[in-house]
């Protein structure tokens, strides 16, 4: 009797496992993929707050209000410009081409696409805003707010969408075999290049160096604020990288997202520890400003 019960249990267990990992329907995969885009986009949107807090905490007290206004403004501008022309500049590009169309985004969702077009727009828009946020941090206390807003409009509406479309939109970089999983080049390369150009053109912050060229220490407005921003950015990276799997409708996709989360956490933790060790060895004296900026 016991053997019969165990045999039946094994049979039913195998049936359950088989059904649990059976391929989901096309509609279910569509829902799960769209859900991944929306939730991941929400996490990436929180990074705007993280950037704002980190920058506000690291600049001098007199510049905090300007930093807050800049971050709210750039996110708003990014949303409008990416809807107005940015998305179609990136995704309206001919296969192997260089430039999409200067047209406004419209919803063209279809079940065969595997995800909602509007969820994809939202996910890509927050990436666009993150690109501008990279520039904002570099140009803190270097540029007035309205010239920065003008640059943000050009970056998020034209520059970033065009180079993004070269790979993610099926443009010439994609045709050449170039791959960018989560924006290491398209987002951070573009944002970093723009930030570097701005820093070169504008030069150092006023008062950063004395007449002899010696570095003048600046007092940060709030280390706890910068630390809070760091943790929010750390949190947001799970959406940034995890959402870049672009699918959650299969067993392998979900496992991949989990692996991405682990790698993301290890990368942030490794950055903190490495920065602390190098700072200690290089400067002999440890500085508390190192950790929030290296996570």
Sequence positions of predicted segments:
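N-terminal secretory/membrane targeting signals
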Residues: 1-23
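Serine/proline-rich low-complexity intrinsically disordered segments, especially terminal tails, linkers
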Residues: 16, 287-288
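Metal/cofactor- and membrane transport-associated sequence elements
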Residues: 23-210, 220-231, 235-263, 269, ...
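Oxyanion-binding "anion nests"
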Residues: 273
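Membrane-interface helix caps and helix-loop-helix hairpins in membrane proteins
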Residues: 283-284
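Single conserved hydrophobic/aromatic residue that forms the stacking wall/gate
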Residues: 288-295
